[in-house]
């Protein structure tokens, strides 16, 4: 289930994250980045690696909560019956871009856990982009659409979606404070 990829990244960057949950989330990121493609191809190793990655991710995020990837995905499922994992997968790279200024060194560790080489030699901007690009590539490799319009989201609903997302329980855990206008802009970027 691709959603676990997002639970671990969101949990790792949430305001409530701490040393133990960071370790759990980084291990889950590593496992899922390594095994997701194989799981989609239905290999035994891929399925087993994903099962372990999902379990480890659950131990992490259940202790710290989530952020606006989930806040924004919940209304998509309510309005359009979009599968929750797909909604999260489409939104994650856009939310990562928004949250990057409030994540310190965490994107370096995300990039490293996802197998990006040379992160120690990268500037902050470079490793943040590398982490986001690694997520985008993994999504592409397993057939996740890049844009919201590809999953049936209608532009006329973006304002209402933004207002609903802002009220979601997960919003408070996001590492970067946001407004309905911020969320609307993220939806617009993900829509086009």
Language-model segments: residues:
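Glycine-rich phosphate/pyrophosphate-binding beta-alpha loops
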Residues: 55-88, 168-173
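Short, amphipathic C-terminal "tail helix"
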Residues: 154-192
């Amino acid at each position: 289930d691709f959603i676990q990829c997002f639970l671990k990244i969101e949990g790792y960057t949430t305001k409530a994250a701490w040393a133990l949950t960071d370790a759990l989330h980084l291990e889950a990121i590593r496992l899922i980045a390594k095994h997701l493609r194989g799981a989609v191809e239905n290999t035994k190793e891929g399925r087993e690696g994903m099962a372990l990655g999902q379990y480890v991710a659950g131990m992490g995020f259940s202790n710290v909560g989530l952020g606006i990837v989930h806040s924004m995905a919940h209304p998509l499922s309510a309005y359009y019956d979009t599968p929750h994992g797909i909604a999260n997968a489409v939104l994650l790279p856009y939310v990562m871009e928004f949250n990057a200024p409030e994540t310190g060194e965490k994107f370096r560790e995300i990039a490293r856990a996802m197998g990006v080489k040379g992160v120690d030699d990268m500037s902050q901007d470079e490793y943040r982009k590398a982490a986001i690009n690694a997520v985008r590539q993994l999504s592409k490799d397993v057939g996740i659409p890049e844009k919201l319009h590809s999953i049936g989201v209608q532009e006329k609903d973006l304002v209402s979606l933004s207002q609903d997302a802002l009220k979601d329980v997960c919003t408070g855990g996001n590492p970067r404070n946001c407004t309905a206008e911020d969320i609307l802009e993220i939806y617009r970027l993900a829509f086009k």
